[in-house]
Amino acid sequence: MKNIIIFLLCVISTNCFAQYTTIDTVKYQFNYATKFSEVEELHPFDDEIVVEIGKDKAMTYGYWGRANDLAYDSIMSHGGNAADYFALGNPIATYNDYVIKNYPQKGLLSVTTYHGKKFIYSEPIVEKKWQLEEGDTTILGYNCRKASCTFRHRSWNVWYAEDIPIPEGPWKLDGLPGMILKAVDTKNQFSFECIGIKENVNKPMSAKLSKRVKTTPVYIERLEKLHSSNFEAYLKLIGSPYASNPKMSKKTACLLEYYEKKDTKK
């Protein structure tokens, strides 16, 4: 399947890439096998994310989220339709956000997401209070030390490689004296494990940043909670004309981070 995606990326038109804003040049690329839980009641889904390290920025995005987006744009720009896209049979992406650190300026990070509209929000990069732990291991030939912290109501164990002196990691996890190659939350609802490293990549770091509605992380959290617990209310909030199934079971959203401790109907 990845060979098909690589072929499509080679024939993508200039118009598709024109939708992307270049923000840096990629020096290193890290691929991670991931597990994401969308709701408390179901098991995690497998996916893959990419972490790109630039000169002064770092960006995380879903491998299949980006690949599917580019493939869809390419098909449409060449006169195809949705049926042509679905005929590819690509995996459904569970992670579609972009997390961009030191954008739009140093010390801030921006997140793009989609809930009926294309949203973007920015927030300060938070310093994590890491604690060193016993349990060192080896990942892809790198000796990795173990550390732990609690970040926005979720506790994490991570393993970082001091031989890769980059204080970054997947998603919003960062701040250690080495690249985080593995991260698992203590509830086993989310995990990231590095499966590939590329050096001297030298390609544009880019993302779709134009024509997005500015919002706040708290508002996005409320949308994600409603999506699982009250889908009808969620559709009304995002202004969707589609009706929900009244028999749809209500579930509890499982989020990577929690800004609010209690659910809200707003």
Report each predicted region and the residues it spans.
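Bacterial Sec-dependent N-terminal signal peptides
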Residues: 1-25
